[in-house]
Amino acid sequence: MNEIHVKDGEGEGEGYRYSLSRSDKLFILAEALNSQTLPESEPYAGERQGASGEAYGETAGTYAFIVNHRGPSDREIKEEELFGVVNEGLETLKELGILPDSVREADRSAYDAVLYSAIDVLEPRNNVAVWKGSLSNIQKNNDRGNRLIDAYIDADDGKLYEFYVRTERTWADMDPDEIAGKWSGYLGLEAPQPYEGNNPLMEMTPYFKKYVFPGTGKGNTTATVGYYDGIQELFVKISR
């Protein structure tokens, strides 16, 4: 009871998952992440907001974010391929001006990777396979400057849906509107719209700006471009 199972019928030629638009994938992932009590990686979430005292992985509502124990399908990115794909994504984000050139490549040996499924519980065929890459605990006391700290990566095509990166840039060096626009183009989404009612207490930092990305079926997704000043960390996130 109270467990969610993901069946993959691709081996039988029927294709269990629906073909989802990018905006629907983004919406399902955001809702699933928001069903968690602590959507960020535990070692680094503490630096951002302090311990919550709650267990990671609890779910609520009609979406869930669970470990995908079956592993990637034949058409999904394998763990041994993941950080090559991640580094291609980082390079693209640099070319777009979202990240500075000083951000280092993600060395596979320095990161942990877990495959998850973001699921619409009421219609489980609507599910999104994502890798979560996080700088390893072993690296916690090492130099984290100019490094990718956390990311959620589409297991189908390697697009970075959410990421936290330590950078030499300050918030004053950044244009959140430009970052949001280029990130939406990178994902193939419609241009972001202003988020109405920005409240300075919505984040654990005063340096952020929120946007709404129109959906094609499921609904709109709110994304945040922000910056943690004390640890010099840029983030683009779709979770609360």
Please report, for each region that a protein language model flagged, where it lies by residue.
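Long, terminal "pre-/pro-" and other extracytoplasmic accessory regions
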Residues: 1-240
